[in-house]
Amino acid sequence: MKKACVHTIQLNNWFPELCDLTLPLIQKWANNIGADFNLISEPKFPGWPANYERFQIWESGAGYEWNINIDADFIINPTLEDVTDNDPSIVRAEAYMHTDVFFYPNQYFLRDGRGISMSDNFILSSWMTHDVWTPLQMSYEEAAKHCIKDSRQVSEFAVSLNIARYGLKCSGAVKDKNKTYHIQSTGCGKSKEDIVELAKAKIKEMGIQ
């Protein structure tokens, strides 16, 4: 198996002004830790939100010891540690959610009982925890009915369902939090111009050359 792959979604040349700032940094970090970089630019799940395309990792990441999913609006300092230096039996993420706040109960959430859900913006998985990328066996319309707040969260529903269904252990992914920053560009209420200026300011603040 290859060591690792970093996967990032950018469909239909999404927000190029921001991605021109963030993607080179993500790619440079991937290179620094000896990982391949996979830009998910072609949809394979028609009718689903763009963020669900991360489940292409189920197939494209099958040949790797580690898979790292990072949203395109994440600023990564290329000097960030190698996050694959971790216990492969644990799925790791940069943000957690309370299951009962975002998703309706089902047999897997109730049986698991932990109430742990993961934000899908930064997820680290290994060959041992690859089940976290199992695509849903239902339509988008059916999946959306499981989401309490926003049907766009079907991606996070799928991740969280797999955590409960397979009993996957969870923890944080990054030790040095000062070397990552999530712009959270979707639904933030800011203009594209303001988002780009925020990204530039954060990159400067983080001392990234």
Please report, for each region that a protein language model flagged, where it lies by residue.
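Short beta-strand-to-loop acidic/aromatic patch adjacent to the donor-nucleotide binding site
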Residues: 64-75
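Long, low-complexity, intrinsically disordered polar/charged segments
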Residues: 1-25, 85-89, 120-121, 132-150, ...
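Short, solvent-exposed loop/turn segments at secondary-structure junctions
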Residues: 11-13, 44-45, 74-75, 96-99, ...
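Conserved donor-nucleotide/metal-binding helix-loop-beta segment in metal-dependent transferases, i.e.
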Residues: 76-110
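Catalytic core and acceptor-binding pocket of nucleotide-sugar-dependent glycosyltransferases
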Residues: 117-207
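Active-site regions of enzymes building and remodeling cell-envelope glycoconjugates
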Residues: 49-57, 67, 87-91, 107-108
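N-terminal anchoring/stem segment of glycosyltransferases
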Residues: 1-56, 60-65, 187-209
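Hydrophobic/aromatic beta-strand patches that form the interior of the parallel beta-sheet core
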Residues: 7, 38, 68-70, 89-91, ...
